[in-house]
């Protein structure tokens, strides 16, 4: 009897144990990441040929304590290596684990290699060659704390490499994980299977191999035991011949049929090629189709299983489309696949909730580093595909109410960009802004006390409801997460799309970018302030400090300003401001753009202006600014500098976003200035619920100064 170890992905150990026992293994014991078992040579070869779930089959050779690198060397050298493989064979060492003495796996592998080579040279005065690619013999060493285990890897390459998949689509499933997903899905051989997002076809091919009784190792061209001195070639030939006979018979006898589709034609061609190499092409029908065109291939029966590993998305921007996809997919399942089973494997349980289906079984497993879940559903017939109650119903009702009121108001105002929802309900802490035909949903970062998975689920519910209420295609919704920006983060790109959208605000045309930055280039809450500046600027010299994308300069220019001067520290935003000015025909030397630290520029200029707009940050500590700036602490210093530039009958519009800001009116008076708060006048209908989003003041020379 041989003592053997079969490794597998975490979470699949119980399934693997059952599989090995069905093959005839004895004394199976589960450990994390695998199963120890006993078996004769026939069982050993059968496990290699027939296990659909094992990653590797290892033959343990020695186990010993390791307190130093010398212990490791001597423990490996104690094995009679020339009795295991010939000196003319190549070998490789796979070493995993570290302890206090062996702190680097590469160093550990080097010591093992030296011990094996020295074992040969001492006994034979010859040495075998190390080969990194497809070695004849693969030695596996696992070090955990002070215990090392040395084993012969009988698999060679991982057993998930069946030999049929040369090319793959993006993010493939390993074949042994795919086999586990199928076994857990409840699918029965003899019944049909559909994978509507099949990629390179792994799930369908693995199921077809099961249905046709085809051994998963039948197509492998390289093994880790053929150069082993104890290799029983006759027994191996007998077992593979038997497997070939079973595969031919199974292909003829199976009644299972398989159907796969994917939007990517290139990947579908790969899937077809993979199925041909696996010997099951005649059982599988592949089509290049968008999932929205999915139909039941067997509407008259029999019923079967829909199984898939749908996309889950790694970037925030992809989530609206994925939420819409899962929502649509859930409706399609109820409409066209009543009576079937559905099984989905995903790294995002939140996306699976968008199906609006109730799972009857759930499993957990790892897909590489990802924690994944598999959910099984029994689909009931529902020709209309009607779902249950709309998710986030309170939010949906509030959004619907706001839209009815604000869409009409915005049309009357002549604006295309406005806020539809602003954390109106505490459970749904998002802002929803309309920009022409597009909508931006910004999630305010939840407190650290909120469970991240619950917060993500609630966000997905919001997106689902937003798409439904606004009847919006998913590619028209942009998702962002708003957090406090520090230092240069406010200027850094979130994406690299470079997609600009031209929108209308009263008589101005303004460019916005909804994807590349945290902000879009247009502060919606300052809309009325910009309109006021336009009316104030006719025939005047206008200065815009901390100008951002220069939208206030555009309104001043369109209002008939004699000149506009736009100052900001960011080259990116100044180029954007120039683009905005140009879109409104505001070109020429009278429209200046200056890249500078606004505070330094203010201290060093003696120019005079009639209208000054300043909207400074609440706090800034940019490296390009020599000192920090706090709007509450420093607003008098700012006003003192602005007074120098303000003509006698001029006006400063001063705005900021600091909640609870207190204007030092006594200090203002001491400077010879007067300040009047106009916050209420600058707040529009779409920000009626958020009276503290900004505060705004008009500052002029006092009567005595004039």
UniProtKB/Swiss-Prot annotation:
Domain THUMP: residue ranges: 43-154
Pfam family, one: THUMP
Compartments, as annotated in UniProt: Cytoplasm
UniProt keywords, alphabetically: Cytoplasm, Methyltransferase, RNA-binding, rRNA processing, S-adenosyl-L-methionine, Transferase
PROSITE patterns: THUMP, UPF0020
Top EC category: transferase
Ranges annotated as spanning the membrane: none
Keyword hit for Electron transport: no
GO molecular function: 23S rRNA (guanine(2445)-N(2))-methyltransferase activity; RNA binding; rRNA (guanine-N7-)-methyltransferase activity
Listed GO CC annotations: cytoplasm
CDD domains assigned: AdoMet_MTases, THUMP_AdoMetMT
Keyword S-adenosyl-L-methionine among record annotations: yes
InterPro entries: 23SrRNA_methyltr_KL, DNA_methylase_N6_adenine_CS, RlmKL-like_Mtase, RlmKL-like_Mtase_CS, RlmL_1st, SAM-dep_methyl-trfase, SAM-dependent_MTases_sf, THUMP_dom
Reaction catalysis annotation: guanosine(2445) in 23S rRNA + S-adenosyl-L-methionine = N(2)-methylguanosine(2445) in 23S rRNA + S-adenosyl-L-homocysteine + H(+); guanosine(2069) in 23S rRNA + S-adenosyl-L-methionine = N(2)-methylguanosine(2069) in 23S rRNA + S-adenosyl-L-homocysteine + H(+)
EC assignment: 2.1.1.173, 2.1.1.264
Superkingdom, natural source: Bacteria
Family the entry assigns: Belongs to the methyltransferase superfamily. RlmKL family.
Function, in words: Specifically methylates the guanine in position 2445 (m2G2445) and the guanine in position 2069 (m7G2069) of 23S rRNA.
Protein name as annotated: Ribosomal RNA large subunit methyltransferase K/L
Lineage of the species this protein comes from: Bacteria, Pseudomonadati, Pseudomonadota, Gammaproteobacteria, Enterobacterales
GN (gene name): rlmL
